[in-house]
Amino acid sequence: MPRPFIEQNVTWLYSDDLDTHAAFYRDVLELPQVLDQGVCRVFQVSPTGFLGVCNKEGRPRGTKGMMVTFLVENVEETYRYLLGKGVEFDGPPNMLGGRTVYSAFFKDPIGYWLEIQEFNDPRWPYPPGRGPRRG
């Protein structure tokens, strides 16, 4: 039997301050909020990818061991845009992984690590019409 197709995915982050956490993704990163469940809010990251922030009883605690990476078409452009929105980065964009990854890191208001990233690897399943930008 073949593996059933996975249509969409949601990454969940947990918070003690749901309003501040949700406002960052809605107002700073400008992700459209697609669902408000009261204790959880869900934002659309891409046509099939979603990010949820939650404050509910019995939830996992802490931000270590978790990072969300947003693959973007142009890291420098996104970096400048987010700087203009007040985002504080860990440093400027940098080439990593033997020149296969170009990225910059920052934290959301709760302390989760976030990354904006471009892959520079022809093996990556790029969106239609795209491929590595960097030589």
Regions found by a protein language model. Name each.
Residues 12-51:
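Core segments of cupin and vicinal oxygen chelate
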